[in-house]
């Protein structure tokens, strides 16, 4: 009985071992299959020689495209001309009216002040008045008149040059010179300086440090007409004909020069103490130049104006500095205290 049981147990153990061997054999087959699949997958993912060549070609092409092109770009032009910034838009030159209006507008923004309209009714030298000293005074023969002056000591700059700038529908001219186009770069630069209240380089070379009086006339509704040559009558010092004893006479070239004369007889001047020169721009556009002592007061300047021009005796007017534009309200101040030595002051009617 014991032997039979042992044999049965042996049979059972052998069966279990066989089953285990079969199971392990099955597991080993599955692992082997998986490994074969992985090997096949790696082989499929491994690039071929052709794939490597194509990838290398793409890499070279990308690097070439990333490099900046050294070929010139045609049709691209960068211009930085001052006249193009100021007078052109979209490649077009603005109308003459716009150019002229901008000139007056910007000149006013740079310190120009309107002159009293009474200058129109006075009839004395009514024309385009403008720019004196180291700045300008802008004017117009019809509606617009502006004045702009800056800088000190305008009397020690040497000669004085009077220039008339006429603005036409088809260009501008200086004095009786030739027509100059608005679209020309040099001419546009000239006008740009005027707009800024600066002396154009062209005029600086002309006066060599002298004083510039630049008049502006608005003729934008007219085309330029070349002026006829004018005969200038003799003016200055000469001899009177028909006199037994030749008499030396002096004829001023214009009424304006009469007002430029020093009227020292109107002022009690002490030559033994320091003096200064004051230029007075009157409301009618004319001017007076007078020497004063530093101790003279603003009220003395007012009295001088009334004595020199009696038509202002019944007028109420104010005196102002030019740059900045400040009314001289305290007339008991001396010229030195008011800080107006060797300067230009304005008369404005109230």
Curated annotation (Swiss-Prot):
SUPFAM superfamilies on file: NSFL1 (p97 ATPase) cofactor p47, SEP domain, Ubiquitin-like
Residue ranges, compositional bias (Acidic residues): 1-29
Domain SEP: 160-225
Sequence ranges of Basic and acidic residues compositional bias: 32-45
Leader sequence residues: none
Organism, scientific name: Xenopus laevis
Localization per record: Nucleus; Cytoplasm, Cytosol; Endoplasmic reticulum; Golgi apparatus
Protein name: UBX domain-containing protein 2B
Alphabetical GO biological process terms: autophagosome assembly; Golgi organization; membrane fusion; nuclear membrane reassembly; proteasome-mediated ubiquitin-dependent protein catabolic process
Region Disordered, residue ranges: 1-46
Domain UBX: 271-348
Family statement: Belongs to the NSFL1C family.
Gene Ontology cellular component terms for the protein in this record: centrosome; cytosol; endoplasmic reticulum; Golgi apparatus; nucleus
InterPro entries to which the protein is assigned, alphabetical: NSFL1C_SEP_dom_sf, SEP_domain, Ubiquitin-like_domsf, UBX_dom
Keywords, in A-Z order: Cytoplasm, Cytoskeleton, Endoplasmic reticulum, Golgi apparatus, Nucleus
Keyword NAD: no
Record's function text: Adapter protein required for Golgi and endoplasmic reticulum biogenesis. Involved in Golgi and endoplasmic reticulum maintenance during interphase and in their reassembly at the end of mitosis. Regulates the centrosomal levels of kinase aurka-a/Aurora A during mitotic progression by promoting aurka-a removal from centrosomes in prophase. Also, regulates spindle orientation during mitosis.
GO terms assigned for molecular function: ubiquitin binding
């Amino acid at each position: 009985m014991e032997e039979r049981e042992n044999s049965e147990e042996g049979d059972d153990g052998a069966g279990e071992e066989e089953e285990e061997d079969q199971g392990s054999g099955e597991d080993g087959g599955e692992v082997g299959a998986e490994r074969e699949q992985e090997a096949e997958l790696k082989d499929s993912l491994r690039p071929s020689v052709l794939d490597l060549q194509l990838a290398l070609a793409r890499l070279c092409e990308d690097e070439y495209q990333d490099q900046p092109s050294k070929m010139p770009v045609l049709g691209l032009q960068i211009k930085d001309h001052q006249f193009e910034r100021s007078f052109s838009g979209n490649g077009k030159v603005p109308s003459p009216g716009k150019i002229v209006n901008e000139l007056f507008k910007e000149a006013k923004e740079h310190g120009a002040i309107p002159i009293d309209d009474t200058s129109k009714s006075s009839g004395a030298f009514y024309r385009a008045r403008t720019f004196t000293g180291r700045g300008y005074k802008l004017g117009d023969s019809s509606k617009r008149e502006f004045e702009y002056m800056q800088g000190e000591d305008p009397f020690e700059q040497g000669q004085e040059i009077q220039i008339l700038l006429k603005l036409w529908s088809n260009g501008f001219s200086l004095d009786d010179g030739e027509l100059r186009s608005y679209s020309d770069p040099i001419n546009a630069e000239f006008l740009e300086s005027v707009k800024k209240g600066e002396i154009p380089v062209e005029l600086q070379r002309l006066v060599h440090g002298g004083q510039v009086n630049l008049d502006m006339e608005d003729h934008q509704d007219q085309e330029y007409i070349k002026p006829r040559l004018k005969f200038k009558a003799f003016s200055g010092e000469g001899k009177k004909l028909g006199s037994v004893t030749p008499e030396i006479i002096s004829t001023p070239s214009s009424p304006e020069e009469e007002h430029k004369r020093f009227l020292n007889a109107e002022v009690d001047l002490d030559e033994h103490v320091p003096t200064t020169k004051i230029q007075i721009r009157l409301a009618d556009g004319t001017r007076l130049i007078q020497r004063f002592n530093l101790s003279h007061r603003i009220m003395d300047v007012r009295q001088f104006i009334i004595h020199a021009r009696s038509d202002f005796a019944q007028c109420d007017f104010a005196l102002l500095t030019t740059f900045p534009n400040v009314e001289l309200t305290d007339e008991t101040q001396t010229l030195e205290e008011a800080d107006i030595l060797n300067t230009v002051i304005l008369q404005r009617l109230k």
